[in-house]
């Protein structure tokens, strides 16, 4: 029986002291989130071993990053590996988690390249939950594929180049508040923070004046003062990297507005930089730097295409008072968490399960209904017989093209609880097809049936598939293999050698997160004329 653990510790070394109270409310939200998954569904399942929680958390979310990983709720031992800057926050967790035996959570502080690498390469580890950069996530994926022992799951949340669109119907005061909160709160050191703002050109002049005025009202200083709005970035290395980006924009004449930087400390002043579009951002700038682009009214779909083309898909914001536009944009944007007429940070798990897609993460969403099963052991049936021949690459590509018809189709829509005046919906969208590699036709058929039963798309192999094809084949979301460990390791290594999103080798039964993206849409219903559901209920 899956074991449910009690409340989380509240405590967060925020980029400003006032933010502690806000972040603490998020910490609390993570604690009961597992309750949204009926635990009776997991009677008889087993934990899949000790799990490494490998969190490269920047100063605002150390406790939350811990609490959004629930292997301990699935009866597993947990080893926390924290970066050296945030050891104290993890000590709070290791010492004070309510009701957890001493040997269940173990804190191993130290640098990722030493402690973390040793943990990930250990064959006794049953899974890894990681928050950090794409580069490090890729390195972990390769290490897991190359080590001895069973193939184990990796859940990665890897940030993004997050955008917001403001059209000419948006309420300017509301939009500016949402932008300032999204871009500059916690000194921009949230994976969900706003990086690229698109403003309709009809309103850009007056809107920019209002935005820069709001920036001028921000107070920079020590995080311990309640009056502080923006504190320092995490360290001097981060400060110098961000400062170099700002200096390049200044040299190119694209610096639109910048606050005065304090004389001491690792501060970066909130900064506004002009860009032609999101494609100008080659990487995420993890700090209080906002990039502004404009668009014409008939270019909305082109803007959406540009945002999707980055390959990232974590958070997205929209400011508009046109309901049809809300529907159109949220139907087309490929992002895990979308926010309408509010800021795009501070997801409340249980109402807003959090996590991205593509380059922004593997899924399933933290705090969502499909998260806990990933930490359980879903044993595959007895392995099938070996293939007698090989499947050609051309045949695989043809089958993938046919199977991916209807990709991104919404399979279901779940209404989640939330405060009055806010709508929260979680939708499931079909991923690219899963390759069902057998071995053997009967096994491949059983794999495909398991995928389709979850709403996913599948391609059944008709012969042996060479491992190196998994490195170059496009149009799939991973592979199922219920055969020998040696061949499975070759498949895992081929998938880990890919560039782009992390794709899994599944050696047990597939789960919902393997076959579907989860996309959440949060709407401030008061911004478009009031809460119709509330008014209707009162009548």
Question: Could you tell me what each predicted segment is?
Answer:
Residues 12, 31, 110, 130-131, ...:
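Short beta-strand and adjacent tight-turn residues that come in two discontinuous sequence segments
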Residues 70-89, 93, 203-210, 302, ...:
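Short amphipathic alpha-helical coupling segments at ligand-binding clamshell hinges
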Residues 102-105, 433:
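Short acidic capping loops at alpha-helix termini that bridge into adjacent secondary structure
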């Amino acid at each position: 029986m899956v074991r449910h653990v009690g409340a989380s510790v509240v405590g967060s070394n925020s980029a400003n002291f006032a933010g502690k109270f806000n972040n603490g409310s998020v910490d609390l939200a993570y604690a009961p989130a597992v309750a949204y998954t009926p635990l009776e569904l997991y009677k008889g399942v087993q934990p899949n071993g000790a799990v490494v929680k490998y969190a490269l958390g920047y100063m605002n979310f150390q406790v939350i990053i811990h609490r959004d990983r629930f292997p301990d709720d699935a009866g597993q031992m947990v080893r926390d590996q924290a970066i050296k800057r945030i050891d104290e926050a993890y000590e709070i967790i290791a010492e004070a988690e309510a009701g957890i035996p001493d040997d269940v959570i173990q804190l191993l502080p130290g640098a990722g390249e030493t402690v973390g690498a040793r943990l990930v390469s250990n064959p006794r580890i049953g899974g890894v939950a990681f928050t950090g950069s794409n580069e490090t996530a890729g390195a972990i994926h390769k290490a897991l594929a190359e080590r001895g022992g069973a193939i184990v799951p990796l859940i990665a949340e890897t940030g993004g180049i997050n955008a917001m669109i403001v059209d000419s119907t948006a309420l300017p005061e509301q939009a500016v508040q949402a932008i300032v909160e999204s871009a500059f709160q916690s000194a921009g050191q949230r994976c969900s923070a706003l990086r690229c703002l698109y403003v309709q050109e009809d309103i850009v002049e007056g809107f920019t004046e209002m935005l820069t005025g709001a920036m001028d009202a921000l107070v920079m200083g020590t995080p311990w003062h309640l009056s502080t709005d923006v504190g320092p970035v995490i360290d001097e290395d981060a400060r110098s990297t961000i400062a170099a980006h700002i200096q390049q924009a200044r040299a190119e004449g694209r610096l639109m507005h910048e606050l005065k930087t304090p004389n001491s400390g690792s501060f970066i002043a909130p900064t506004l930089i002009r860009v032609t579009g999101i494609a100008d951002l080659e990487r995420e700038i993890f700090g209080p730097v906002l990039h502004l682009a404009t668009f014409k009214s008939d270019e909305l779909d082109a803007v959406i295409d540009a945002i999707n083309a980055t390959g990232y898909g974590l958070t997205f914001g929209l400011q508009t008072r046109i309901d049809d536009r809300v529907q159109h944009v949220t139907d087309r944007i490929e992002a895990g968490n979308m926010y309408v007429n509010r800021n795009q940070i501070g997801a409340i798990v249980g109402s807003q399960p959090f996590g991205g897609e593509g380059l922004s993460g593997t899924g399933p969403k933290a705090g969502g209904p499909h998260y806990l099963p990933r930490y359980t052991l879903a044993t595959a049936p007895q392995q099938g017989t070996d293939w007698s021949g090989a499947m050609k690459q051309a045949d695989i590509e043809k089958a993938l093209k046919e199977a991916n018809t209807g990709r991104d189709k919404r399979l279901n829509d779940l209404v989640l609880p939330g405060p009055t005046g806010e709508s929260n919906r979680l939708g499931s969208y079909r991923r690219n097809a899963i390759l069902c590699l057998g071995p053997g036709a009967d096994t491949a058929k059983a794999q495909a049936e398991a995928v389709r039963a979850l709403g996913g798309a599948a391609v059944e192999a008709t012969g042996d598939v060479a491992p190196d094809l998994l490195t170059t084949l496009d149009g799939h979301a991973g592979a199922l293999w219920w055969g020998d460990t040696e061949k499975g390791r070759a498949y895992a290594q081929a998938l880990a050698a890919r560039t782009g999103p992390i794709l899994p080798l599944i050696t047990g039964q597939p789960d919902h997160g393997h076959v579907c993206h989860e996309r959440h849409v949060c709407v401030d219903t008061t911004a478009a004329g009031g809460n119709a559901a509330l008014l209707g209920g009162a009548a």
